[in-house]
């Protein structure tokens, strides 16, 4: 039996086939790499394209210098995101999306790309939430990719004011994607 590659996660049922490294985009927008780390994402053939489109639309919509920067989006499973959530946030439970903004050096080394950070999205939680809320999976995935991206460019929702600003940005970006307001009929939660 061969050893799994470092960083490779088995599929959501415990199998260990090769993971897929999705394609990247490059333009005035950030260079985005989507890594499909858990094979349960294979059930959603359009996941990579959905994430890339959401990130590109968000980058076009926000007032942030993202051109030439890089970010990675890891499509993972509940077990791995639970571990990340426990390690980085002290919450030992799965969540839908985590963002890890990159620390910016005072001086960028010549030729080195500027890193925006990383986003992790958990398949089972996203699927469960989409089903529970009666939303198309790709709409919910787009929302979470946008949410994660906004964290990378400085948005947050720690206060009511921040939450309102972030949700307004999400609504505007999702509207550009033809996705209905994900907060319609909900009480604001920061």
UniProtKB/Swiss-Prot annotation:
<dbReference type="GO" id="GO:0005737">
    <property type="term" value="C:cytoplasm"/>
</dbReference>
<comment type="similarity">
    <text>Belongs to the endoribonuclease YbeY family.</text>
</comment>
<feature type="binding site">
    <location>
        <position position="157"/>
    </location>
    <ligand>
        <name>Zn(2+)</name>
    </ligand>
</feature>
<keyword id="KW-0690">Ribosome biogenesis</keyword>
<feature type="binding site">
    <location>
        <position position="151"/>
    </location>
    <ligand>
        <name>Zn(2+)</name>
    </ligand>
</feature>
<dbReference type="GO" id="GO:0008270">
    <property type="term" value="F:zinc ion binding"/>
</dbReference>
<comment type="function">
    <text>Single strand-specific metallo-endoribonuclease involved in late-stage 70S ribosome quality control and in maturation of the 3' terminus of the 16S rRNA.</text>
</comment>
<feature type="region of interest" description="Disordered">
    <location>
        <begin position="1"/>
        <end position="25"/>
    </location>
</feature>
<feature type="binding site">
    <location>
        <position position="147"/>
    </location>
    <ligand>
        <name>Zn(2+)</name>
    </ligand>
</feature>
<dbReference type="GO" id="GO:0006364">
    <property type="term" value="P:rRNA processing"/>
</dbReference>
<keyword id="KW-0540">Nuclease</keyword>
<keyword id="KW-0963">Cytoplasm</keyword>
<keyword id="KW-0479">Metal-binding</keyword>
<keyword id="KW-0378">Hydrolase</keyword>
<dbReference type="InterPro" id="IPR023091">
    <property type="entry name" value="MetalPrtase_cat_dom_sf_prd"/>
</dbReference>
<dbReference type="InterPro" id="IPR002036">
    <property type="entry name" value="YbeY"/>
</dbReference>
<protein>
    <recommendedName>
        <fullName>Endoribonuclease YbeY</fullName>
        <ecNumber>3.1.-.-</ecNumber>
    </recommendedName>
</protein>
<dbReference type="GO" id="GO:0004222">
    <property type="term" value="F:metalloendopeptidase activity"/>
</dbReference>
<dbReference type="GO" id="GO:0004521">
    <property type="term" value="F:RNA endonuclease activity"/>
</dbReference>
<keyword id="KW-0698">rRNA processing</keyword>
<dbReference type="Pfam" id="PF02130">
    <property type="entry name" value="YbeY"/>
</dbReference>
<keyword id="KW-0255">Endonuclease</keyword>
<keyword id="KW-0862">Zinc</keyword>
<dbReference type="InterPro" id="IPR020549">
    <property type="entry name" value="YbeY_CS"/>
</dbReference>
